[in-house]
Amino acid sequence: MAPRRRRHTRIAGLRVVGTATLVAATTLTACSGSAAAQIDYVVDGALVTYNTNTVIGAASAGAQAFARTLTGFGYHGPDGQVVADRDFGTVSVVEGSPLILDYQISDDAVYSDGRPVTCDDLVLAWAAQSGRFPGFDAATQAGYVDIANIECTAGQKKARVSFIPDRSVVDHSQLFTATSLMPSHVIADQLHIDVTAALLSNNVSAVEQIARLWNSTWDLKPGRSHDEVRSRFPSSGPYKIESVLDDGAVVLVANDRWWGTKAITKRITVWPQGADIQDRVNNRSVDVVDVAAGSSGSLVTPDSYQRTDYPSAGIEQLIFAPQGSLAQSRTRRALALCVPRDAIARDAGVPIANSRLSPATDDALTDADGAAEARQFGRVDPAAARDALGGTPLTVRIGYGRPNARLAATIGTIADACAPAGITVSDVTVDTPGPQALRDGKIDVLLASTGGATGSGSSGSSAMDAYDLHSGNGNNLSGYANAQIDGIISALAVSADPAERARLLAEAAPVLWDEMPTLPLYRQQRTLLMSTKMYAVSRNPTRWGAGWNMDRWALAR
């Protein structure tokens, strides 16, 4: 479907970038305007699945699209912080050591198909991401791996979550938040089983079937009937999916069963980033653009739009495949020696990033992490790279999420710098998402942000994001396994002491720079472009992006 074109007339009024508490309708009334019925929203990449907790889903733009269709006990606010969502339910601390939490879902909470939201959904989220049950292609185990058990009576609204002794996860508020809770009854209906009973009793054959459906049943494909969309993709938020368009866009409409404050705009079409963004901005057929800075080239901002550039919580990096030409740390270090990290970061307008285990925050602890060990990899040294390879030629295939002008230029810069070292770098087009292409051996390197994402990719928590390098974690795309690093990552998850965290990071840095599972480049920058008639849109450094409060958005007519 071609994007619609609207005629805009200028109106006088105050431009507001708001938060979830801002009542856009009041502002519109004050400006003598009214809200348009539809908004067009462009996000970083493809919308391939409703389940943003799989490896592919977490790396996609799904979180930007579905933060207000799949709600949870919290959402990520404009600074990346977790904000309690009391419309959904409440969390109370029963005991601090070992950590025990009670999760109470609102009595009013109901999916758009009329089925209640229950503790069964928490059990499924935990089981899928705990690492205890085989078959689930979960992106991360962070936090969930430390849960000892969940007490849930099927069909009820309350769950008690007990953590393993001495594993009181500091950032436990990151668990069971928006987009993490999938509707377990969809799987139960397909398999005709009690999902909670099967998981809590570890029924092996049933768990295998549950995992298969959790991985794939929420794939987004055009052409599904209205009834199938309604039954397979129920919503627990202010918006629900109406349809998937042929070009991959997803149409969201107001959910009439939402029990909280109703969405201001009745319809939002979420578009995957394409090469036509400038044209769409020029003809005013898009209202909000939320993408990595530079990914759409220079992107000229017309007078009828306003633009904000800001740092994300994700790190743009080279993620090396566990097989192929870069399977050995020696060859990865050789490539790193000819990558002009200084020039690449300068082109992005930011400093070089060195941190792997404290990536989400931009503070003194992060700045110090790995700084000394990274020094030899700060500038291009083709002679050292050639010597590290013993003069043997090396061919490297790099892929990335397209279209992205900045990353294409980055690969060109690397190719030019590495050629004198006898390293041939090629820009490879793949027909599968980046993480899958890396798994399948179609590329040797994925150029992406945290977790292989096209967007920020970050949870907003360094302790959670550090699990990208924990063995067995789904988005540990390099397949890295080191028991010492696993122990450090686990220790970081339960430590709030800055001195202890600094000690742990200092212990990890020499190992990680020697074994080189990834090569951090720079903190991904974001561009938020919106019509001057948009209200209540605000930036967000995490993978949920600007969509975190889309139910408050309004476009003045």
Swiss-Prot record:
Protein family according to the UniProt entry: To M.tuberculosis Rv2585c and M.leprae ML0489.
Signal peptide region: 1-30
Lipid anchor positions (S-diacylglycerol cysteine): 31
InterPro entries: SBP_5, SBP_5_dom
Natural source organism: Mycobacterium bovis (strain ATCC BAA-935 / AF2122/97)
Protein name: Uncharacterized lipoprotein Mb2616c
Main location: membrane
Lipidation (N-palmitoyl cysteine): 31
Annotated localization: Cell membrane
GO cellular component, one term: plasma membrane
PANTHER family for this protein: MONOACYL PHOSPHATIDYLINOSITOL TETRAMANNOSIDE-BINDING PROTEIN LPQW-RELATED, PERIPLASMIC BINDING COMPONENT OF ABC TRANSPORTER
Keyword Cell membrane carried by entry: yes
Highest taxon listed in the record's lineage: Bacteria
Keywords tagged on the record: Cell membrane, Lipoprotein, Membrane, Palmitate, Signal
Topology of this chain in the membrane: Lipid-anchor
Gene Ontology molecular function: any one: peptide transmembrane transporter activity
A biological process from GO: peptide transport
Keyword flag 4Fe-4S: no
